Design a protein with these regions (language model features):
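Active-site lining segments that contact anionic ligands and/or coordinate catalytic metals
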Residues: 47-52, 65, 79-81, 99-104
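Short proline/glycine-enriched turn/loop segments at secondary-structure junctions
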Residues: 40-44, 72-73, 91-96
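Active-site "cap" helix and flanking loop/linker of ATP-utilizing ligase/carboxylase catalytic domains
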Residues: 5-63
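Residues in well-ordered beta-strands of folded domains
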Residues: 33, 54-56, 82-86, 106, ...
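Short intrinsically disordered coil segments
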Residues: 19, 67-74, 120-124
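Glycine-rich active-site loop/lid that clamps phosphate-bearing ligands
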Residues: 56-90
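Generic C-terminus detector
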Residues: 86-131
Length: 131
């Protein structure tokens, strides 16, 4: 076991595991912390191939955030969660570390090959619009 905490590894790993495996480690951590019985934690089959995509400005790109655009075909087929921490009007700088992310999203695919192919083209289907 690498981690059992809801934040131990960061990058929303526990949230992604809940979507992929249907097991809520965060709920169990809270239950354990307050002395409640745990909900069944079991090994289940993964529902597809999942990834977290950290959203950030492209190298050299900076300005005032206006919006993010995702190709509608990609959004409808693969994107399951989008969590933006940046809002319209915020200043955006090129990505240099985790504190520069604009948000993140979880995507689900039917195969590893499909995931690799779509993610390799992220610069084609994801646009950060700055003023």
């Amino acid at each position: 076991i690498m981690e059992v905490s809801p934040r131990g590894g960061g990058c929303k790993i526990a949230e992604l595991q809940r979507l992929a495996f249907g097991v809520d480690l965060i709920e169990n951590e809270v239950r354990a912390a307050v002395g409640m019985p745990l909900v069944d934690v079991r090994q289940t089959e993964c529902d597809g191939h999942w990834c977290e995509f950290v959203i950030h400005a492209r190298p050299g790109q900076s300005g005032v955030f206006k919006r993010m655009e995702i190709d509608e075909d990609i959004r409808s087929k693969y994107v399951k969660v989008v969590d933006m921490t940046t809002k319209e009007g915020d200043m955006v700088h090129p990505f240099t570390g985790a504190n520069m992310s604009l948000g993140d999203m979880f995507l689900r695919f039917d195969s590893r090959e499909e995931m690799d192919a779509v993610m390799a083209r992220s610069n084609e289907w994801l646009r950060i619009i700055l003023e």
